[in-house]
């Protein structure tokens, strides 16, 4: 397939072909994190599942920083690629890699010192606090690998080669699951085994991805003037910061909301954590569609084909509707079996009812996050970041305020009632900005 199919093929076909490898790859990524939780929940204890879940909200913020930063950098790289300015594109790629390597090292060191205290601030139940802190310490050691893998994947996506990260992710996922089984069920390492398995698998994937990216860049004409350009970094930062906010909105909100859930005890936290793992899989196709729209928009603007951008959003909306219908069916019909994968027959009634209640309610509202991510992807790809950022902050604010003010009084169900309200508000603001047409002049 030609690398420039995003600017040549019909919009629906182009978006489908581009997003499909990302969907498959992200499903593998989420599947092995789900396996992490399922293994500790079934083979260690319900408290171990709660510990990994308590850590998940914080660790997912770092994942979102890496993904959001990669998306911001990929917009610039996509524009240069669409305009066939390969020399500037290579400079942008290396600037992104060096920048995020430095950021990951700083965050990793900070996390080693502050991770345990953050778990305390988040009101983590005492019976799983030590395990959560142990998991975090190992996780922060592998933060550079996490950042580099996600940024490298974004670079491949910007070049229209979204299949390459998929191949490495499949390898990493399978290897991670094998290590999980060995370290937890055979070596009895508990939550530490899960953390080490993730670190090793991501490290290997990052190194291999870097080697293949260099080979692909060497095959393109044009030579970069320097390995690091502050002007390119400035432009990437302008787009990356709102992208990071957008990617982190869910996770920051989840972390703050989880502090409320933690107050209901480790049993409720275990059920909530299981539901979060399943929700993360359900969000994958919506996120991939949004990321595909972002690269599609950036390349078509770079190729002076803005009329195709509008067609692309319409095509993405059709994809969202289909995905949302499938997700709703599975969550409404199979919610009990899904939660049972993590908790098993020995799980407490509180854990089971919490997880099932969340999935049953949320199944009806995934169209909101899909529409939100599609229009957000267009604005991000066009560089229209102001209202994009406002919309995502409103989303975060609504979710946190409703959960913190209403859950203690009306029960834990208010935690998930707040989620679709935030999604809808985010979409409404972003769509209104899209309708103004300002994105065409960015």
Model-identified regions with their sequence ranges:
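Transmembrane alpha-helix boundary and packing residues in multipass membrane permease domains
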Residues: 22, 26, 38, 75, ...
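Small-residue-rich hydrophobic transmembrane alpha-helices
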Residues: 49-109, 146-165, 271-329, 333-335, ...
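Hydrophobic transmembrane alpha-helices of multi-pass small-molecule transporters
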Residues: 61-64, 176-180, 206-210, 281-284, ...
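Short runs within selected transmembrane alpha-helices of multi-pass transporters and secretion channels
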Residues: 70, 139-157, 165-173, 194-207, ...
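Transmembrane helical elements of multi-pass membrane transporters/channels
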Residues: 17-36, 138, 172, 201-205, ...
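N-terminal transmembrane alpha-helices
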Residues: 7-44, 57-72, 76, 101-108, ...
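Short alpha-helical transmembrane segments in multi-pass integral membrane proteins
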Residues: 1-19, 77-142, 186-241, 297-364, ...
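Helix-terminus/linker motif at the lipid-water interface of multi-pass membrane proteins
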Residues: 31-49, 119-126, 182-189, 248-277, ...
